Amino acid sequence: MKIMLANFAKMVNDSGGLAKVTVAFANEMVRRGHDVSLLYCDGHQGDFFYPLDAKVRAYNLCWQKGRYIQVPWWMKLKREFLRPFSPVMSRDVNDQFMQKYLLGEVRRLLELEQPEIIVSSQPAASRLLLCDIAVEIPVISMSHGDPEDYFHIYPKGEIPAIEKSAACQVLLPSFVDHIKRRFPEQKVVVIGNVVPQYDVTADLQADKDRHKIIFIGRLVKNHKRPHLLIKAFVKLANRFPDWELELWGAESNKAYTKSLQHMIEKNGLQSRIHLKGVTRDVAGVLREGDIFVLPSAYEGFGLSLAEAMSMGVPVIGYKNCPAVNELIKHEENGLLCEDGVDALAEALQRLMDTRELRVQYGAQAKKSVEQYAAENVWGASVYS
């Protein structure tokens, strides 16, 4: 089958979850004998962070005939002017850019590739394909987050594309109703992300001079919120002198990263709290961990969290965080706590205090993500 992936986001040297899932999906479809092409939008040219199979034909829509197609200054100005008043209208400027400057290239590539099915990673991509170009090729719209957001913070012009899709894929069972409630006749399938199943897991029983709390995720203030974890650790640092905190992930904003570093230095914990940057060895980082914490406000799935669970590491998250509160079963495979620093510190203290509890939750965590093994996820795939 000829499959086209439409991920209208950056891919070059991007270590984020969407890039990881996109590459994994493309590579798996090639392995299964399908013919795969990929459309993406990136201001840079170069290699992907995650290795893409050489058989996948990748097209950067933002580079056409050797020329960078960027958002014009007046569109940027309009987008930033609207942002404080209406995030929805601000996002719609991005859609207008795609309609005006990228639509023709998408048409050309559709004619060139002649796909039999298109897998879209964003409502914006689905809108361009189904509403603006009006393709007759089946389009499957994937949700990499909570689809409830589509009806509140996404441009209204993208919503009809959800109904026009041949099917919608969501990551968790609780997300099905968020689409079905609006479009009862729409086909919605639940297919989670593939989680690696590690044979060699974290040794939580080992006697160590130092224990590690691990965070892996992009350093984003209002999303992943690593500052809450740093503040919680500061509260416990004196009581647990043999513990340290490692934060792994790409910088999203220099000022925010500087504020994290300042927080660490102000509390004199430079030797115990480390901003480590991006890693290509997630398994190696997790294997050294004793506790994994994801203090996100929201998640679509929480891939780094699931990978930590597969490594047999006990986990902590916030009970009001979508996806996290489905992966973590409180006091079974980890701990869920109320939002905020104090509650997070209390949850951390429980696990830091008791190795037996860490071992118990870690073992259950590993079992609970076995359902996301590659053979289970790809076997359920509507594309296979």
Which sequence ranges carry the predicted segments?
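Short hydrophobic beta-strand element within catalytic cores of glycosyltransferases
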Residues: P314-Y318
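Aromatic "clamp/platform" in nucleotide-sugar-dependent glycosyltransferases that forms part
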Residues: V278, A297
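Acidic anion/phosphate-binding donor-loop and adjacent secondary structure
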Residues: D149-I153, K180, G192-H211
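Conserved acidic donor-binding segment of nucleotide-sugar-dependent glycosyltransferases
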Residues: K319, K329-E331, L335-D342, R350-R355
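A conserved mid-protein helix/loop that constitutes part of the nucleotide-sugar donor-binding site
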Residues: G16-A24, H211, V220-K235, L245, ...
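Glycosyltransferase donor-sugar binding loop
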Residues: L38-Q45, I216, E244-K258
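A short, well-ordered alpha-helix in the C-terminal region of glycosyltransferases
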Residues: A343, R350, L357-Q371, Y383
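Nucleotide-activated donor-binding/catalytic signature segment of Leloir-type glycosyltransferases, i.e.
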Residues: K258-G277
